Structures are given as structure tokens and as C-alpha cells.
Amino acid sequence: MIVTGVLLFILLELFAQGSQAFKALDPEEAWYVYERCHEDHLPSGPNRETYLKTWKFWKLEPNDAVTHCYVKCTLAGLQMYDEKTNTFKPETVPVQHEAYKSFTEVESSKVNELQQALSSLNAGSGSCAEVFNAYLPVHNKYVGVSRKIYHGTVDSVAKIYEAKPEIKKQEESFFAYCAKKALGANGKEGYTKLRDYELADSAEFRNAMDCVFRGFRYMDDSGLKVDEVVRDFNLINKSDLEPEVRSVLASCTGTQAYDYYSCLLNSPVKEDFRNAFYFHELRSANYGYLAMGKVYEGPEKVKEELKKLNY
């Protein structure tokens, strides 16, 4: 009986962990996936805009290596494909549907068909090309369904934002969003402190910084994502600081967002960290910033653009 009880407990734990892994994406999270995959896979050169326009209309063209890797990136971000196990994840489709079905108005029968279609796919070696070729027929048949489920239509997204004001809005920076979320009535004052990089060791300020770090994708439930922090230094043309940034973060005694934030602000890279953080704040109000071909033009230009953002 004891063994049976232990086995049941383990199975329940595994089920709970699996359920937690498939949390439905809200519009902000889906938008981030699309734009980050644009950033990572759009080619430079004259064809960049053509790729971007085509993908934004949910057309997986042209059928080439660039589009193949963009599709794999997007499927992984939307939790429809798992890179670690190299398998498609049909079980996540109804989870996403159930969370927003009152807004998307997609027929459950169509969702079931999409789920069944995904369940029959084989990712092969897991290469971009094999994942793309496996998924393309499913996409072509069910693009109308998946586009609604995964927040690809303007009308349904607008309804969700109206009904759920707790979701970060487009054109709202994560500094502004997190100040309001974590500091409530003191949001304006807290926003100023966040923008001015003042250290305020309070529970509210710590919560605000945790919100910002998660919004910037510096952290998730598994901990700090050092590569994401380093990436922001690279984007302000400070890739030479990578060893020092990694060293600062590795030697930080705490493990919370506020701790890492404080360590960076009290390190030799503090000024560059401020610049990187400012630049990410600007981009957090428009996830398509880099995909549109914009680049870092220095701290003064960033501050000038930040002034245009509404708190």
C-alpha cells in the first residue's frame, strides 16, 4: 500500500509538472515570440522587408532555409514543438484554445482536428528543414484556426486587451507596466525611480524589478538567463564586455532580480548596463523595433525616444 501511495504521488507530481509546462500564452507573450523569431531569423539585405511582410500575413514563404528556421523558432515559442525532445506537442493546443475561446470563437471540432494533425507529425532529425516540411501541410490546412488560437487576429486580441487590463499592452514599456503592477498608487513615483535607476530596497521595488527582469526575459521560473543579459550588451555594441558581465552575475550573492540588478549597478559595467537597460525599455514598448531594421544610436537618442512613450 505504501509503494502504491508513493507511486500515485509521483504520478500526480509528474502530471502537475506537465500541466504547468503548458501554460496558455496571452497576447503579449505570443507577440514576443513572433517578433523575437523575426529578430533572430530575418536576413539582412534588400529582401528583409519582403520576408517580414510575408510572415506577418502567416504565409510561410519563401520555402528556404531562412523561413524554415523562423518556423521552427515560432513553433517552439508557441509550445507547439519541443526542441529538447524534438517532438511536436499537440497536447498544448487545447490548453491554448480553452484559455481564450470566448474571444477567438473557434469551433472545438476544428481545434481537435488541428491537435490530431499535429499528433501525427514526425520532426525527423529536428533540423529546421525537417520540422518545417513536417508542419507545412498542417499549417496550410489549419492556418485560420491556429491564427485565431495564437493571437494572430486584430479583432480577438483587441477584445482580450479590453477584458484583461492586467496584460501588458502594446506601446507600453515594461518599466511603466511593472511600476503600475507592483507599486499601484505609487506607480508614477516608482516609475521615475525605475527609470532613474535608484535603488529602493522595499518589497514593492523588488517586485517591480522582478516584473521587469521577467518582462525583458532576463529571468523565468528556472532562474537567471545570463545569455539574455549579455545579448542586451551586444545590442549596444558592447560585446567586448561579455566576460565581465558574466563574471559580475556569477559572483552575485543573491538569486533574485533585485540582487542581479544591484550587482550590475554596483559594478564597473554600470554605465553600459544603464544604457543597455534603457535601450531594452524602449524596445519593450515595440517588440518589432529591431525587426524593422532599427539599431542602437547611442544613449542620448534612446532617451529622446523614451520621452515619447506614455506612462
Swiss-Prot record:
InterPro entries: PBP/GOBP (IPR006170), PBP_GOBP_sf (IPR036728). This is Long form salivary protein D7L1. It is found in: Secreted. Gene3D superfamilies: Pheromone/general odorant binding protein domain. Keywords: Disulfide bond, Hemostasis impairing toxin, Platelet aggregation inhibiting toxin, Secreted, Signal, Toxin, Vasoactive, Vasodilator. It comes from Anopheles gambiae (African malaria mosquito). Modulates blood feeding of female mosquitoes on vertebrate species by binding and sequestering different mediators involved in the host response. Binds leukotriene C4 and U-46619, a stable analog of thromboxane A2. Inhibits agonist-induced platelet aggregation. Exhibits vasodilating activity. Disulfide bonds join C37-C73, C69-C128, C178-C211, C252-C263.
